[in-house]
Every structure is written in structure tokens, then in C-alpha cells.
């Protein structure tokens, strides 16, 4: 039997094997189920027509028809309409993603066809007896202005009307799209099933992407004039009749754990009193229970959030000390952490608001236990308590699954982005001001193995002002595919995302993480720091094989910043700036005119850096005599044109780059 590789590897990264090949076993499985159950004649005819079309396409493109993805439609119908064996369920579970739109009844399922560049949607319980219509669509940030919506209509018990529409810029009107792209293949009182291309090449449709997408939905009993070119958008306010959900639509297949025997462990706070202040970092140093004399691999971790809305993010740090060395137990504010416990700084697992369970790929796991392993860890939880509530107690933490069967690679976590420092500032009144953190070529050259590392997971992180985050990958003067990008990032939805494309980072490569911030409501500059009112810019990447490099981050160099404040005081006559004063006070005293904002941006983009090329204990790698004054990686400023592959592409479809709607790089995000 021909063996089909699960992955294709290159110097740039790892792609999942060709979509059609990956589905080969699913296609066979669905075929045999259909044969065994002797489906109705109509379904057999549809299947035969699909196979004939598949064969024609395969001959035209030089591919075996067996591997073409047309059977994905039949597979999805099989998964959602009848029970399968346990084996087939395990196979199909990786393809099918699900979410409840109203948290109890209306279930949205979808499958991503990467080969055909389309998504198949399935809705359950969208209608009930009294509903006349249901809509599902996408908007940029959850609002109803300029939304892309498919309307489904029940006409006197006949569920056969669907209309592709878009909303007006004020969100008050619905207009019929001249190009209809909501392709329905099943619609009745229980089920809606339709598909959409990633990019319909329709300027009135939103392009489906791998970042955060906002799904808008509603249903109602009133009759709509869908045959009209324009009608008023129904005003639905009941929570079980309308809503918005954030999700990653174009996501990688789910990962199944191949090991059948797993050990479990919980690392949680123990009755931690939440202080009645806005920001607290709470630390709990504890000794791990269980038999860790034998080496294990962590294969999955699940957040246990006991105080939703207050717990902002959490991390577990391992204490890198001798096997028998005692670390003082502690349960209190991290600012009073015992000095000896500060050795607990190697990141193991982490979570931020909006994230769920994270599963490692079958080839890698996070090492824990074994000879020489110190059993102490530090759980750090960020409490965000803006209302300053008192009397709250928290027991949040993680549930961890481990396997005694070791996998091929040890995995690890690395921090990319900006240092947590007030050397970086964001002027007030900005729509999307960018700050970039660099992992420079000298650092990866000093720290990574010759064959490089494979990044399989990524979690982007900012505080309240972040609106877009991306990490770019450079090899010399060539820019490779981005590691991760979220143009519609929300700090309320900070998923740890398994990457569909897994980049390989080689020694000498550079990674540039850029965060964009909205400070329209701020009166003074926002600064980098730990408080929720400060800002961060981080990409936590999960990768293998593990290295000693844990932090690859930057900030503007001390000398550059000192010269900047001298210039502000002596040339720009900003008399609130004091040359020996606190950086935060200096930034906040500046009157931010547009030329001064441009000067700050230019300084951050072009001037030398202070680099953190650090091991987990804080020591620097020896790749340079000094990591102060390092040249920033040159970043090409470019305006992405997403629809350049459309056959009838018209540049006029792009929105004008009007001031206030776009960032400094000329990219419109709102």
C-alpha cells in the first residue's frame, strides 16, 4: 500500500500534506459507510455526479480523482446526520469545529477545506416554529456596520430562500448583494448547511482569514422584504435571538492524543484572597505531587478559571534548581516573593483570557520529571479587578495531562516581542500606533540548533489597547510567510492557536512582532508595563526541539531614549521633560503634535535596540560582546493587497487611505 506522508517539510517550515491526501482515509471511510447502509437512490445519484465531476477535474489538473476533496461535502453530511463507529469519530473529530451561538441551542459547526479554499457551515436549531428568518454573517469587530450577511427565510413552511446581503456603513440598512455567494446545499426546519469561499472576489463580502473573526447572527418572526434591494435591518435585542461570537474560523485541524494511558495533575491557587485593587500578580510556589521520578511529556493543559472576569492571565514557571534543593513555599503578592523563589522562572504552561485547552502535536511534548528534575513550580495569576471588589477568593490554575511514553521531541515556550518596560510609549489619540519588538538574527544565530526550530503554536498578547498583532519572519533580506497574524485582535479572546503552517526558524533568522494600539480615548501617553492600564506586546510561541532560549525581546536602547528626551527638551521646548527624570513622567509631559508622533515612530523603527536574548534564569547568550545598541531588523513597509489573485480584480475596491481610519503603515483595519 502506498504510504502518504502526514507532513511536507522544507527549509521554511512544515505544511500539512496536501489537503486531498490528508482526507484520503476519510473519503474511503465515508464511501464504505454509504455502501453498508444503502443510502437512498437520490443520494447515490448525487454521489455519482460528484465522482464524475471529480474525475473530470482530476484529469484536467493531472491528479488522481481518488484524492480530490469533493467528498468533503459527503463527509460533513455523514458526521452531522448519523452516528459513526468510534474509530471514524476519532478520524473525523479533527476536521469538525463547533460552537454554540447562544450558549445552549443554536449550534454552528464548520469544516475548513484548505484545498478548495472554502468553508462548509452547518447550523442546528436555527429556526423554530415561529421564526420566519435567520441570518448569519461576519463583521469586522462585532458591529453591524458594513457586515457581510446571509439571510435564510422560511416562506410558509418552505425553507428555500437565501439572500446574500451587506449592511450600510451606519448599520441601519440591509442591501442585496449583486453577487450571491451564500451557496446552500441543505435547508429545513432543523438544519441550515451552506458554504462560502475564503475570498469570493466580491468587494462587498468580507474575506475569511486565520485571525479573529466576529460572527453576527439573529432570527425573528417578522416578515422581511428580502426581494427588495434595500430594507431596514431588523432590531433584535433578546439575548437568545441575536448575538456576536468571536472565533478563529480558518483554524488548523484539532489534535487527538494518541496515548491511551495518561496521568493527570492540577496546579492551582489555594484559597487566594483577591486584593481590592485594580492590578495584582499573585504567586503560589508549590511542590508538585505524584511520581515524577520518571520523565513524562505534558501532552495537554486545560485552564481552570474559578473567578471569570477577574483572572486575566496565568503562567506556571518551573524552579530550575537541583533535584533535592528545597524552594520556600509561598502564597501571596508576587512583589513580596522570597528571593530564593525567583529562580522559578522557566515557563511551562500559560493561559490568557479567551483561551481554551491546548494540545501538543503528536510528535512533541513538554518535558516534566525524571532524574535531576526539581519538583517545585510557581503559579503566577494576574488579577484584573477594576471595580476593586473585596471578599473574593480564587482557586484558578491548570489541569495537566502527561504521558509516560516519551515523544520524539521536547517542546518549549519562547517569548517574542517587547520588554515589559516604560521605555516604550504610545501617544494619545491614535487609531493604530505600531510598536515592534525584535528577535534579531544575532540572537537566533547564538541560541538555535543548526536545523532550527519548528513553531507549532502561538498566543498573541496585549492589554486593553491592542487592536492588531503580527509576527513576521525574515531570513536575510527575504521575508518569509508570517508566523501569526490577527488583524482583528481582541484582548478578550487571546487563544493559544495551533498553526496550520508551522514555520521553521533557522539560526540567523529574525522575528519581528508588531502590536498596534488604539489610544483614541487617552489624554496622555500609554506606557509599557505590567499593570492592565499599561501595555504589553508579546507572542508566546510553542516550538520544538527545546532550546535554552526563552526570551527574545527588545526595547529602544538607553542611549537612544536619552538623546530623544534631550531633543524634546532643547529643540522641541518640552519643558516638562527632565533629563534625569522618570521616563514615564517625561513621556506623559510631552504635547503630542503629529510631527512629534512621527518622530517617535521613526525613532522606534530605525534606532538601535536593547536586546533580551535570555535563558530562563535571565542570563544572556554570548553571541555578542554587548546586547545594548543592537541594530533593528530592517522591515519593509508594505500595503497588502489581499485580492490581487481575483480574476476581475479592481484596485478601486480598496478603501481610500483616509487619516483616522488607517495606521502609519497605510493599512486600514477598521
Curated annotation (Swiss-Prot):
Binding positions for Cu(2+) B per the UniProt entry: 461, 463, 536
Enzyme Commission numbers on file = 1.14.17.-
Q: Report the SS bond pairs.
A: 283-334, 319-344, 439-552, 443-613, 515-537
- Record's subcellular location: Membrane
Membrane topology classification: Single-pass membrane protein
Please verify whether the record's keywords include Glycoprotein. yes
> Protein name, please?
Tyramine beta-hydroxylase
Organism annotation: Drosophila melanogaster (Fruit fly)
What does the record give as the organism's lineage?
Eukaryota, Metazoa, Ecdysozoa, Arthropoda, Hexapoda
Amino acid at each position: 500500500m502506498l504510504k502518504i506522508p502526514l507532513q511536507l517539510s522544507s527549509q521554511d517550515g512544515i505544511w500539512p500534506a496536501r489537503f486531498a491526501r490528508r482526507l484520503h482515509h476519510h473519503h474511503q471511510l465515508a464511501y464504505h459507510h454509504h455502501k453498508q447502509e444503502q443510502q437512498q437512490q437520490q443520494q447515490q445519484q448525487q454521489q455519482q455526479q460528484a465522482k464524475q465531476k471529480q474525475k473530470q477535474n482530476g484529469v484536467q489538473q493531472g491528479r488522481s480523482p481518488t484524492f480530490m476533496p469533493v467528498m468533503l461535502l459527503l463527509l460533513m453530511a455523514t458526521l452531522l446526520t448519523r452516528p459513526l463507529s468510534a474509530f471514524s469519530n476519532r478520524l473525523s473529530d479533527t476536521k469538525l469545529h463547533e460552537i454554540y451561538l447562544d450558549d445552549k441551542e443554536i449550534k454552528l459547526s464548520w469544516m475548513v477545506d484548505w484545498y478548495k479554499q472554502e468553508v462548509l457551515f452547518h447550523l442546528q436549531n436555527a429556526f423554530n416554529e415561529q421564526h420566519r428568518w435567520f441570518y448569519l454573517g461576519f463583521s469586522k469587530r462585532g458591529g453591524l456596520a458594513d457586515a457581510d450577511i446571509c439571510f435564510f427565510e422560511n416562506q410558509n413552511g418552505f425553507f428555500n430562500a437565501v439572500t446574500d446581503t451587506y449592511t450600510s456603513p451606519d448599520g441601519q440598512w440591509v442591501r442585496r448583494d449583486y453577487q450571491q455567494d451564500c451557496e446552500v446545499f441543505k435547508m429545513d426546519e432543523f438544519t441550515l448547511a451552506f458554504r462560502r469561499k475564503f475570498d469570493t472576489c466580491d468587494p462587498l463580502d468580507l474575506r475569511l482569514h486565520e485571525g479573529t473573526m466576529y460572527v453576527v447572527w439573529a432570527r425573528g418572526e417578522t416578515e422581511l422584504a428580502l426581494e427588495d434591494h434595500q430594507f431596514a435591518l431588523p432590531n433584535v435585542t433578546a439575548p437568545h435571538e441575536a448575538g456576536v461570537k468571536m472565533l478563529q474560523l480558518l483554524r488548523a485541524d484539532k489534535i487527538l492524543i494518541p496515548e491511551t494511558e495518561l496521568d493527570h495533575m492540577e496546579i492551582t491557587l489555594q484559597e487566594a484572597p483577591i486584593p481590592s485593587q485594580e492590578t495584582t500578580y499573585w504567586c503560589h510556589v508549590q511542590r508538585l505531587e505524584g511520581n515524577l521520578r520518571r520523565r513524562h511529556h505534558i501532552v495537554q493543559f486545560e485552564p481552570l478559571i474559578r473567578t471569570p472576569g477577574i483572572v486575566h492571565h496565568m503562567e506556571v514557571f518551573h524552579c530550575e534548581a537541583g533535584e533535592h534543593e528545597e524552594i520556600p513555599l509561598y502564597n501571596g503578592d508576587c512583589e513580596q516573593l522570597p528571593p530564593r523563589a525567583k529562580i522559578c522562572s522557566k515557563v511551562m504552561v500559560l493561559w490568557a483570557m479567551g483561551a481554551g485547552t491546548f494540545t501538543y502535536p503528536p510528535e512533541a511534548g513538554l518535558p516534566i520529571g525524571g532524574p535531576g528534575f526539581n519538583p517545585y513550580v510557581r503559579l503566577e495569576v494576574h488579577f484584573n479587578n477594576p471595580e476593586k471588589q473585596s471578599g473574593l477568593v480564587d482557586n484558578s490554575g491548570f489541569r495537566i495531562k502527561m504521558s509516560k511514553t516519551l515523544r520524539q521531541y521536547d517542546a518549549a515556550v519562547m517569548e517574542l516581542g517587547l520588554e515589559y518596560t516604560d521605555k516604550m510609549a504610545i501617544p494619545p489619540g491614535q487609531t493604530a500606533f505600531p510598536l515592534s519588538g525584535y528577535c534579531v538574527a544575532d540572537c537566533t544565530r547564538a541560541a538555535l540548533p543548526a536545523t532550527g526550530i519548528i513553531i507549532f503554536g502561538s498566543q498573541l498578547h496585549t492589554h486593553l489597547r491592542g487592536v492588531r498583532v503580527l509576527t513576521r519572519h525574515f531570513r536575510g533580506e527575504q521575508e518569509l510567510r508570517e508566523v501569526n497574524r490577527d488583524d482583528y485582535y481582541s484582548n478578550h479572546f487571546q487563544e493559544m492557536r495551533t498553526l496550520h503552517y508551522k514555520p521553521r526558524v533557522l539560526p540567523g533568522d529574525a522575528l519581528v512582532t508588531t502590536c498596534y494600539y488604539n489610544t483614541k480615548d487617552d489624554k496622555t501617553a500609554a506606557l509599557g508595563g505590567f499593570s492592565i492600564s499599561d501595555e504589553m506586546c508579546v507572542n508566546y510561541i510553542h516550538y520544538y526541539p527545546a532550546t535554552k532560549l526563552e526570551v527574545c525581546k527588545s526595547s529602544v536602547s538607553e542611549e537612544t531614549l536619552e538623546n530623544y528626551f534631550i531633543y524634546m527638551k532643547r529643540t522641541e521646548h518640552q519643558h516638562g521633560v527632565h533629563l534625569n527624570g522618570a521616563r514615564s513622567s517625561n513621556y506623559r509631559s510631552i504635547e503630542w503634535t503629529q510631527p512629534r508622533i512621527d518622530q517617535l515612530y521613526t525613532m522606534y523603527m530605525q534606532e538601535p535596540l536593547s536586546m533580551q536574548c535570555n535563558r530562563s534564569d535571565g542570563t544572556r547568550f554570548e553571541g555578542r560582546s554587548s546586547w545594548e545598541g543592537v541594530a533593528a531588523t530592517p522591515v519593509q513597509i508594505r500595503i497588502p493587497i489581499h485580492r490581487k489573485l481575483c480574476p476581475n480584480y479592481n484596485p478601486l475596491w480598496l478603501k481610500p487611505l483616509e487619516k483616522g481610519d488607517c495606521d502609519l503603515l497605510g493599512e486600514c483595519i477598521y
